[in-house]
From Swiss-Prot:
Keyword Membrane attached: no
Keyword Cell cycle found: no
Pathway annotation from the record: Pyrimidine metabolism; UMP biosynthesis via de novo pathway; UMP from orotate: step 1/2
GO BP of this protein: 'de novo' UMP biosynthetic process; pyrimidine nucleobase biosynthetic process
Complex and partners: Homodimer.
GO MF term list: magnesium ion binding; orotate phosphoribosyltransferase activity
Binding residues annotated for 5-phospho-alpha-D-ribose 1-diphosphate, in chain numbering: E116, D117, I118, V119, T120, T121, G122, L123, S124
Positions contributing to orotate binding: T120, R148
Protein name: Orotate phosphoribosyltransferase 2
Family the UniProt entry places it in: Belongs to the purine/pyrimidine phosphoribosyltransferase family. PyrE subfamily.
Species name: Mesorhizobium japonicum (strain LMG 29417 / CECT 9101 / MAFF 303099) (Mesorhizobium loti (strain MAFF 303099))
Length: 192
C-alpha cells in the first residue's frame, strides 16, 4: 500500500484535521491525524493493518513471538496487525508515567515487534523498547501506520512505516505567525 492510499483512507474517514494542534510530543502542528476516526471502521483498520503486517513480514527475518502496542494509541493497530501475522498481541500501559507490562508475562529472549499508530518523535516506541528490554525481550523492529517525520525519527531499532507523511511540527516557542493566531487544541492520548 502506498502513502497516497493510506492518506486516502484517512481522508475518507475525515481523519485529516487542520487547525492548531498540540501533539502528544508537545510539538505544535497545523495538521492532526485523528486515527480514532479511522480505527472506528473495522474495514479500514483491517486494510491498513493487513498491509502493515505484509511490510513487517518482508522486513523482519525469523520468527516474531509477539506484537506489542503502547497504550492507548497502539492498542488497535497492534491487535489487528498481530492477527494478520498470526502471533499474540500484548500491550504496555503507563503506570506512574512509565510504560509497564502489567497484564502479561513475556519470556526472556522473546522476539517482539512494537506496533504504533502514528509516530512523530518516536518517544512512545523508545519508552516501550526500554520497558521490554528490561524484561529481557528482544525488540527486532517497530512499525507504524504513519511516520509523520518521513523517516527522520530514529527509535533504536528498524522503523517500518506503512506511510511516510511529513507534516510540519514546531516547538511552542517557534510557531509561525499564522499558526500562533489560531487557538491550540490538544487531541492526543499520552496522559490517558
Amino acid at each position: 500500500m502506498k502513502t497516497d492510499e493510506v492518506l486516502g483512507i484517512f481522508r475518507e474517514a475525515g481523519a485529516v484535521l487542520e487547525g492548531h494542534f498540540i501533539l502528544t510530543s508537545g510539538l505544535r502542528s497545523p495538521v492532526f491525524l485523528q486515527k480514532a476516526r479511522v480505527f472506528m471502521h473495522a474495514d479500514k483498520t483491517e486494510r491498513l493493518c493487513r498491509a502493515l503486517a505484509e511490510k513487517i513480514r518482508a522486513a523482519v527475518p525469523g520468527k516474531i513471538d509477539y506484537v506489542v502496542g503502547p497504550a492507548i494509541g497502539g492498542l488497535i493497530p497492534a491487535y489487528e496487525t498481530s492477527r494478520h501475522l498470526g502471533v499474540p498481541a500484548i500491550w504496555v500501559e503507563r503506570e506512574g508515567g512509565e510504560f509497564r507490562l502489567r497484564r502479561f508475562e513475556i519470556a526472556r529472549g522473546a522476539r517482539v515487534v512494537i506496533v504504533e499508530d502514528i509516530v512523530t518523535t518516536g518517544l512512545s516506541i523508545r519508552e516501550t523498547i526500554e520497558c521490554l528490554r528490561e524484561l529481557g525481550a528482544e525488540v527486532v523492529a517497530a512499525a507504524c501506520i504513519i511516520d509523520r517525520s518521513a523517516g527522520k525519527t530514529h527509535v533504536g531499532v528498524p522503523l517500518i512505516a506503512l506511510a511516510e507523511y511529513e507534516v510540519p511540527a514546531y516547538p511552542p516557542d517557534r510557531l509561525p505567525p499564522e499558526l500562533a493566531a489560531i487557538p491550540a487544541v490538544k487531541p492526543g492520548s499520552r496522559n490517558i
